[in-house]
């Protein structure tokens, strides 16, 4: 027995309503209406042969499971709106189906084959709602500032949300904490959560406070209070302030605390324990890196005593080879100089002559000690550029000082003679003799002589 089935008769039964039910009541009423309606019972009769075929197929594949029908896929209202790939014809047809599913009537004929006028009306209603939702959204960030947003500027995929929104002015760290949900940022949520009584989940679910939506689309939850513009971000419930300008925190210095907890007024005094902890932490992070581990291993292997000895031996061999090659190149280098200890002071001149003959390289390498020895090198002809060494060599030419000229008996010219008053007895008897230490008697006589002289001067003046 053949059945003729139209698409309009079958498809409403395979598609569930697109918009999710907000409450359990709505869901149950919708199901009851479907079951009780004539559409549900009458449509199953012609579908009976198809159903049996599906059942046979399911039992053949899985014999343990009894007759099972695959549940039809749910269409999400938002996803359906956001999909841009769908053609206009498809969307219109789906809109009709959603309309029919959401408003089931008891009349079999009207629900399955609605008239053109009803379809057109439903289409217009849906189109108007979507257009209003997308374009005619009023944007008001704060009270008293009523802005109407331009639909051409910054409309996103999510309808009713604009890039001008305050979401973009929030710091990225807070944005991540507040708005990241299932790996995607929900645009349009308020920048600050206003009331601390509400939980975070309820505030995220509620619609944005600054976007005015049509009443048909808005949920029953009350709109959020807009936070005051002048209030700082530290007063938000998510960021509980550790310290404010009015309160003073008493910090216990016995335990080390990071500088972020310390108050502004408190002087920063670094703790030694805190510093060591930081250092240890830094070391741990360094040691964990694989590159540093490899370098440490190589250093440890190098620093072993056996390897160090080997390295020293290799260096010595290389030096000897270089020395031999240099000697072969220049014949002057072969003339070996006698050691410094074996040389007498007279032999130094001959050694110096040999040094002058030898090239600069050998001089530096072999006999560096002779160059800076006891006897400084005296150049026979002083160069134009006068160095310290040249001046030192010419020291013997410089005339000796005044002290060396005079004999030991004569007094030097540089020392000034003191004007001393000698007693008369000494002055008369020994004119040339100068006592080293004057006796007490001499001092007394000197005093008396000076007193007499003073009196005579006074008498003369009078």
Curated annotation (Swiss-Prot):
Cellular component aspect of the GO annotation: cytoplasm; mitotic spindle; Nsk1-Dlc1 complex; nucleolus; nucleoplasm; nucleus; outer kinetochore; outer plaque of mitotic spindle pole body
Q: Name the Gene Ontology biological process terms.
A: attachment of mitotic spindle microtubules to kinetochore; centromere clustering
For this UniProt record, the keywords arranged alphabetically read as follows:
Centromere, Chromosome, Cytoplasm, Cytoskeleton, Kinetochore, Nucleus
Task: Mark the transmembrane ranges.
Answer: none
* GO MF annotation: an example: microtubule plus-end binding
Q: For bias kind Polar residues, which ranges apply?
A: 104-120, 146-156, 229-240, 422-444
PTM comment text: Phosphorylated by cdk1 at prometaphase arrest. Phosphorylation prevents nsk1 kinetochore and spindle targeting. Dephosphorylated by clp1 at anaphase onset controls its relocalization.
Region annotation (Disordered) maps to 104-161, 180-240, 320-462
Localization recorded for this chain is: Nucleus, Nucleolus; Cytoplasm, Cytoskeleton, Spindle; Chromosome, Centromere, Kinetochore
Q: What is its main location?
A: nucleus
Basic residues bias locations:
449-462
Q: Where is the composition biased (Basic and acidic residues)?
A: 121-138, 180-189, 324-333
- Entry function: Ensures chromosome alignment and accurate chromosome segregation during mitosis. Promotes proper kinetochore-microtubule (k-MT) interactions during anaphase B. The phosphorylation status of nsk1 affects the proper k-MT coupling, ensuring that it interacts stably only at the correct time during mitosis.
Oligomeric state and interaction partners are given as: Interacts with dlc1. The dlc1-nsk1 complex seems to oligomerize in chain-like structures. Also binds directly to spindle microtubules.
Protein name as annotated: Kinetochore protein nsk1
User: What organism does the record attribute this protein to?
Assistant: Schizosaccharomyces pombe (strain 972 / ATCC 24843)
The gene is: nsk1
């Amino acid at each position: 027995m053949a059945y003729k089935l139209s698409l309009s008769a079958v498809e409403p039964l395979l598609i569930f309503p697109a918009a999710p039910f907000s409450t359990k009541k709505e869901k149950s009423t919708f199901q009851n209406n479907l079951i009780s309606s004539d559409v549900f019972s009458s449509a199953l009769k012609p579908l009976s042969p198809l159903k049996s075929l599906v059942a046979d197929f399911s039992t053949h594949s899985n014999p343990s499971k009894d007759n099972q029908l695959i549940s039809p896929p749910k269409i999400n209202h938002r996803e359906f709106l956001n999909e841009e790939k769908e053609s206009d014809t498809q969307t219109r047809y789906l809109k009709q189906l959603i309309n029919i599913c959401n408003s089931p009537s008891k009349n079999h004929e009207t629900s399955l084959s609605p008239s053109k006028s009803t379809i057109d009306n439903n289409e217009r209603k849906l189109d108007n709602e979507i257009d209003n939702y997308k374009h005619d959204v009023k944007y008001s960030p704060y009270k008293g500032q009523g802005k109407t947003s331009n639909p051409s500027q910054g409309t996103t995929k999510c309808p009713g949300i604009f890039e001008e929104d305050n979401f973009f002015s929030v710091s990225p760290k807070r944005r991540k904490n507040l708005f990241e949900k299932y790996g995607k940022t929900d645009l349009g949520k308020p920048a600050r959560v206003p009331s601390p009584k509400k939980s975070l989940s309820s505030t995220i679910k509620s619609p944005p406070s600054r976007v005015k939506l049509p009443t048909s689309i808005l949920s029953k939850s009350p709109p959020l209070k807009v936070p005051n513009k002048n209030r700082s971000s530290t007063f938000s419930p998510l960021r509980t302030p550790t310290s404010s300008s009015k309160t003073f925190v008493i910090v216990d210095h016995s335990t080390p605390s990071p500088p972020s907890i310390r108050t502004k007024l408190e002087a920063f005094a670094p703790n030694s324990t805190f510093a060591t902890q930081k250092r240890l932490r830094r070391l741990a992070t360094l040691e964990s890196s694989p590159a540093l581990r490899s370098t440490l291993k190589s250093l440890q292997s190098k620093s072993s005593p056996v390897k160090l000895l080997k390295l020293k031996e290799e260096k010595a061999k290389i030096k000897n080879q270089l020395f031999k090659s240099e000697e072969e190149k220049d014949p002057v280098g072969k003339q070996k100089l006698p050691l410094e200890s074996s040389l007498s002071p007279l032999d130094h001149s001959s050694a110096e002559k040999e040094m002058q003959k030898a090239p600069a390289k050998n001089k530096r390498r072999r006999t560096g000690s002779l160059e800076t020895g006891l006897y400084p090198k005296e150049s026979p002809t002083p160069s134009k550029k006068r160095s310290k060494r040249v001046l030192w060599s010419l020291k013997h030419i410089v005339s000796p000082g005044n002290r060396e000229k005079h004999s030991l008996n004569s007094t030097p010219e540089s020392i000034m003679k003191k004007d001393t008053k000698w007693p008369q007895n000494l002055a008369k008897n020994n004119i040339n003799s100068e006592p080293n230490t004057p006796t007490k008697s001499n001092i007394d006589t000197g005093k008396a002589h000076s007193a007499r002289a003073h009196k005579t001067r006074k008498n003369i003046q009078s």
